[in-house]
C-alpha cells in the first residue's frame, strides 16, 4: 500500500477528518495573530498564557469537570487581561509579569494534579497536556463544531478590525493620536490569543503552542515585506504545515504536536534559504 492509498484509507475514518479540520482552523487562527504578536514583541505572551491554560485545565481536572474548556478558557482570558494591565504598570515590566504568572500557573497546576488527581497514569496525563497527545484524533462532533465556531469568530474579529490592528501594531502612539482606542484593541488581541491557545492545547500541547504562533510569522517575514503579504503568507504556511504535520503523524505514528512543530521548523529553514537567495537575485 503506497502513501496515497494509505491516505485514502485513513480519510474514510471520521476522526481523521475531524483532526484535519480542527488542526487547519487552529493553524489559521494562530497565524493571523502571530504576525501582530511578533511585530509588537509580544511573542512571549503566547508561551505565558499556554502555561496558564495548563493551570486552568489542572483545576478543571481536580474539580472533576468532564469538559475542561469553559473553565480553562475563562482562566486564560482573565490572565490575559491581567497581564495586559500589569504590563502597563511601571513597577512590574511586561516580560517579568508574564514570566511570573506563567511559571506560577504551571507550578500550581502540576501541584494540584499531584495532590488531588485520581488518575492512575498522572505522568502520562501531564506529559500529554504539555506536549500534545492523540486527543486531537478523538475529537467529538460537538468539539469540532465548537472549534469551528470559535475559529470563525477569531477570523471575523481579525478581518473586521484589520485596519485598527494594523495601526496599533506598527505605531501605537500615532494610533492613539488619531483617536484609535489602542488599549481596547490590545485587550481584544490578548483575549483572541487566549482563545486560540485554549483551542490549540489539544493539537500541540501547552508547551508547544507558541510555535504555532511564532514560526509561520517569522517564516513569512523572510519572504514578504508588507503587513498584508506577511499575514497572507503566514496563514498559507501555517495551514500547510499543520496539514502536512497531521498527515505525517498519522502515517508515521508520531506525536501530532511535535510533528507539526518539526514541519514548521523545516519550513522556517527553507524560507530563510529562499529569502537569502531572493535577496541575492534582486
Describe these PLM feature segments.
Residues 22-30, 52, 56, 60, ...:
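Alpha-helical transmembrane segments in multi-pass membrane proteins
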Residues 35-120, 220-232, 249-253, 276-277:
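Short loop segments and helix-boundary regions at transmembrane helix junctions
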Residues 1-28:
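Membrane-interfacial amphipathic/re-entrant helices at transmembrane-helix boundaries
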Residues 20-24, 69-74, 96-100, 144-149, ...:
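Hydrophobic alpha-helical transmembrane segments
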Residues 139-216:
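Helix-loop-helix "hairpin" substructures at the membrane interface of multi-pass membrane proteins
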Residues 6-7, 102-159:
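Transmembrane helix-bundle core of multi-pass membrane transporters
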Residues 257-282:
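Cytosolic-side transmembrane-helix boundaries in multi-pass membrane proteins
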Residues 202-258:
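Transmembrane alpha-helical segments in multi-pass inner-membrane proteins
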Amino acid at each position: 500500500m503506497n502513501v496515497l492509498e494509505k491516505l485514502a484509507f485513513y480519510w474514510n475514518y471520521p476522526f481523521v477528518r475531524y483532526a484535519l479540520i480542527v488542526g487547519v482552523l487552529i493553524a489559521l487562527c494562530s497565524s493571523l495573530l502571530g504576525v501582530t504578536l511578533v511585530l509588537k514583541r509580544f511573542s512571549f505572551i503566547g508561551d505565558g498564557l499556554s502555561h496558564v491554560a495548563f493551570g486552568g485545565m489542572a483545576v478543571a481536572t481536580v474539580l472533576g469537570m468532564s469538559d475542561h474548556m469553559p473553565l480553562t478558557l475563562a482562566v486564560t482570558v482573565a490572565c490575559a487581561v491581567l497581564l495586559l494591565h500589569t504590563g502597563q504598570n511601571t513597577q512590574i515590566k511586561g516580560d517579568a509579569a508574564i514570566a511570573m504568572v506563567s511559571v506560577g500557573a504551571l507550578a500550581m497546576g502540576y501541584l494540584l494534579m499531584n495532590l488531588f488527581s485520581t488518575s492512575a497514569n498522572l505522568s502520562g496525563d501531564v506529559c500529554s497536556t504539555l506536549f500534545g497527545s492523540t486527543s486531537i484524533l478523538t475529537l467529538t462532533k460537538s468539539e469540532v463544531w465548537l472549534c469551528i465556531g470559535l475559529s470563525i469568530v477569531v477570523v471575523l474579529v481579525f478581518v473586521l478590525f484589520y485596519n485598527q490592528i494594523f495601526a496599533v501594531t506598527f505605531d501605537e502612539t500615532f494610533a492613539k493620536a488619531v483617536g484609535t482606542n489602542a488599549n481596547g484593541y490590545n485587550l481584544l488581541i490578548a483575549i483572541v490569543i487566549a482563545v486560540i491557545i485554549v483551542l490549540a492545547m489539544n493539537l500541540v500541547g501547552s508547551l508547544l503552542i507558541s510555535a504555532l504562533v511564532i514560526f509561520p510569522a517569522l517564516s513569512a517575514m523572510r519572504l514578504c515585506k508588507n503587513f498584508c503579504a506577511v499575514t497572507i503568507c503566514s496563514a498559507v504556511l501555517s495551514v500547510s504545515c499543520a496539514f502536512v504535520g497531521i498527515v505525517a503523524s498519522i502515517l508515521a505514528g508520531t506525536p501530532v504536536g511535535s510533528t507539526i512543530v518539526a514541519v514548521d521548523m523545516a519550513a522556517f529553514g527553507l524560507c530563510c534559504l529562499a529569502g537569502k537567495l531572493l535577496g541575492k537575485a534582486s
